[in-house]
Amino acid sequence: MSFIDSMIAAVSPKKAYEREAWRQGLEAMRGYDAAGFGRINSGWRAHNESAEITDRYSRDVVRARARDLERNSDILQAVVLAYKRNVVGKGFTLRARTGDDDLNRQIEKLWRQWCKARNCDVTGEQSFTEILRMAVERKKVDGGILFLFRHTSGGVVPFKLQAIEVDELDVTQSAPHRQGNRVVGGIEYNSWRRPVGYWIQQYDLEGWRLLQPIYIDAKDAYFLKSKRRPSQIREMSDMSHTITRIRDVNEFINAVSVKERIAACLAVLIKKTIPTGTSLGRSGIRGPDGRVDYSGKKLGPGMIMEMGAGDEAQVVDPKGAATDATAFLKVQQGLIGAGQGLSYEAVSRDMSGSTYSSARQNAIEDEDTYAEDVELLTEFMSEVYEQFIISCYLSGVITFPGFWDKKAEYMAHDWVKSPKKWIDPAKESTADKTALQSGQKTYQEICAERGKDWRQAIDETAEVLEYGREKGIEMGGVIFGNGTAAAQQNAGGQPPQG
């Protein structure tokens, strides 16, 4: 109780009690400091709306600004390229799991042919891996990308992909294709908010929009995007919460560049005096008043120039304390990377302050971030693969006995991502060996991390050993290390006879 309350209590206990009761009630209502509207939060007004209402009026503006930074900001490109390198990298390898080795090899061979640009892309310009890289970039900048499954002639199978930007969804369409559905943002939904179709705007070759959109059934399309709220319907740029900081950094860099250019300038001013008499000489050097004319003259290396009598050259050198932008940029890049779930090293490529342990830990944390996009991408790839298998069966390219009864078995598959190179091969290979021998990892897990199929790895190893024996060379020691027949032979002993 304050001094004033004590004075009031001495005169009127009832009033003091009421003041204290109201004060405690006010404290109970406040609950959270974050919900207060005091001096600090007085201008912070926020409202709870559904995700679509929140995103609808900002989606196009945010996407346009993100694209502008995509074209003009090296910092945003650093974030996007980090995702492209680590989510797609060198691509994915298909491992068919039908249970029939001959059929698996046939499917994998045909898949490699289909992944070429002329077979998988309706435009014939991008291979499947290039399409995946573009999908990652468009998801980060635009928020998503739409793929249409086109069954066209040409190619190894009558199936190709058509990439559609989210701008091409017709937001003006209101009449549904099927009665009872609703169209919101160019996407038609049923009563359960499940997408059942997409309305796509049509353009001619010069980019002029045609009046009538076309309807694409949801089973013939795949919308690659992230969903962060149950009420979210359309996409939202993944860069929405970092583009303001990226733009601030760009403006800061431009301001520092201008300041440093000004600081690098050097000028000379001539302080003139009026001569005491008429001077003789060429008119090209002296003016009508007899003084030396310096107009149009510039400084040059090693120059020698005569000045007028009593004239004085004053140098203007605007150099000041150089702005140390390194610390500021490092903090900002760290915040930008953190906003995208990445470490500072992944975004800036600056490893000067990193040790092996810190670099390895950051790489592990970054892998968990990339795993979310890898999961989304592999779901899309699996959908494409299933369409590919169905097209192979319907076109008769591959024979699948009892296909519709055993469709799940014929479509079983795995994706093997191309491995990344080790930071320290000696340490990481030793760690893998220890994990394998102690049972912390299986041989299958070790091979999967290296982007290999464990059965194929064993087959290749057996092939090397068998070929070495045929040529009279024991390769066991080379492959497996000490304690093998090759190691004993090199030590002067006799290898065991097979």
Outline where the language-model segments fall:
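C-terminal anchoring/interaction modules
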Residues: S2-A16, D350, R360-Q361, E379-G498
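Short, Φ-rich (hydrophobic/aromatic) sequence segments
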Residues: Y57, A64-R95, I131-K140, M239-K259, ...
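Structured, mid-chain assembly/scaffold modules that mediate subunit interfaces
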Residues: E70-K227
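Surface-exposed loop-to-helix/strand elements on domain peripheries
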Residues: D101-N104, E108, I304-I423
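A broad, structural surface signal
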Residues: R105-K116, C120, M134-V141, I145, ...
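Short amphipathic alpha-helical segments with coiled-coil-like heptad repeat character
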Residues: W199-D204, Y344-E345, K452-D459
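Extended, charged amphipathic alpha-helical segments
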Residues: Y222-A359, F403-W404, A486-A487
